[in-house]
Design a protein with these regions (language model features):
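Mature-chain termini and adjacent capping regions
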Residues: 1-154
Length: 154
C-alpha cells in the first residue's frame, strides 16, 4: 500500500505528498459525458454541464460543470479541462475532493482548490491547494495542511 510521506516543514509551507495511485496515461484519450453541451467555435471551448464525468485511463473526474479548452487549430486536441462544483477525482485507491480542479493535459498536472480533501485508504489530508503531477504521482499541498495518518495503514 502507498504511504503518505509528509515533509515536516511547518503549516505555512507546501507539503510534499506521495500520491502514487493518482497517475494517468496522459496520452490516452479523454472521454467526457454530461447532461448538456454548449460549444463555442470562436474561442475553441466547450461547456459540459450536469453530471459531468471525465475519464482518462483509470483516472475519473466528476463535477457539476466542466469547461474544455481545445488547442489552437481546432477541436482535435484538448489543452485543458476546468471542473467546478462538487469536484471528485479518483484514481485507484486515491481520491480527492475540491471546489475546483484544473487539468492541464500538456503539463500532465491537476490543480485542486477550494477545501481540498485527499484520501488514501484510511489516511486523510486536507489543504487549500493541491497540485498533482500525474506522471510521477507526486503532489504538493499548500495552505493550512491537516492530516490524519493511520499507523500501520496504507
Amino acid at each position: 500500500m502507498i504511504a503518505l510521506l509528509l515533509t515536516a516543514a511547518g503549516p505555512a509551507l507546501a507539503q510534499g505528498v506521495a500520491f502514487g495511485g493518482m497517475r494517468a496515461d496522459t496520452s490516452a484519450p479523454v472521454e467526457v459525458s454530461a447532461d448538456n453541451l454548449s460549444v463555442n467555435q470562436s474561442d475553441g471551448s466547450a461547456l459540459f454541464t450536469g453530471n459531468v464525468v471525465i475519464g482518462q485511463g483509470e483516472m475519473r473526474l466528476s463535477a457539476d460543470e466542466v469547461t474544455v479548452e481545445y488547442a489552437a487549430g481546432g477541436q482535435e486536441r484538448i489543452r485543458s479541462l476546468t471542473a467546478v462544483g462538487s469536484v471528485t477525482l479518483v484514481s485507484g485507491e486515491d481520491a480527492a475532493e475540491a471546489g475546483q480542479a484544473v487539468y492541464d493535459v500538456d503539463a500532465g498536472s491537476v490543480v485542486l482548490t477550494g477545501d481540498v480533501l485527499l484520501t488514501q485508504g484510511q489516511n486523510v489530508l486536507s489543504g487549500d491547494r493541491v497540485t498533482v503531477d500525474l506522471a510521477s504521482g507526486s503532489a504538493q499541498v499548500q495552505g493550512r495542511v491537516r492530516s490524519v495518518l493511520q499507523p500501520g495503514g496504507n
